[in-house]
Structures are given as C-alpha cells and as structure tokens.
C-alpha cells in the first residue's frame, strides 16, 4: 500500500498581510492561487507537492510551545540566518540559546524562531 502524502498545513493567523509577507519574504515561499477569493485565505507552495494555507481571522496572537513547529529545509542555514538578522528576527537553538545553531547527531544544522503569530519555525539544512 502506498504511503499517504502531505497535501497541506493550515495555519490560523491574526494579520493575514503580515503573515503573507513573512512566509513570502522571509521564508521564501511562492504564493499560489487559492479558490476562495474572500481575502481570508493565502496559499503557498512548499516543495514539489505540498502547500501552506494561511487563514486569517484569529482573535489574537497566542503563545505556542517550540515542540509544535513547522520545519523548512534550506541549502544554507548560515545564509538563512543572514536573512533573519537583516530583518531583525531573533533565532535560537533547540535549547533556547539566542543566536545559536544546534547541530544534530547526524550533522544537520537547525535553528528556531517565531512567525508573526507566535508559531515556532525550524529551519535546517537536511537534504533527505
């Protein structure tokens, strides 16, 4: 039996424009058409077959735990850190040390930071 594939992840956001800008300009995702055209939805392509769906309308920005996070793989964690630094976005390692990188036992580098709604994002250089 074929394993299921991930179609999309939906994230409920407070300020849709701010989140759109973050995922497009900071994370580097490409916007794609969405079928609703109601001003409450934005969709982005993730890799070859998956999507991120932002849904506006959250009542407030709330705190989230780091263990619940989205993860994006990039070619260079160091280059990505330069983007965060340029945009004054703080990052930390898995333990919570500011401006630090975690290197996993398999050699993958990873960092953590928050999106505009307080959702944790991991960025790593895994090539799987």
Residue map of PLM features:
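N-terminal beta-strand motif that seeds the catalytic metal site of vicinal oxygen chelate
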Residues: 1-17, 68-70, 127
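Core segments of cupin and vicinal oxygen chelate
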Residues: 11-51
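Short, charged/polar surface micro-motifs in flexible loops or helix N-caps
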Residues: 48-51, 61, 75-79
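Short glycine-enriched loop/turn motifs at secondary-structure junctions
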Residues: 3-5, 62-67, 104-105
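Vicinal oxygen chelate
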Residues: 16, 70-117
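Short beta->alpha transition motifs characteristic of CBS
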Residues: 104, 123-128
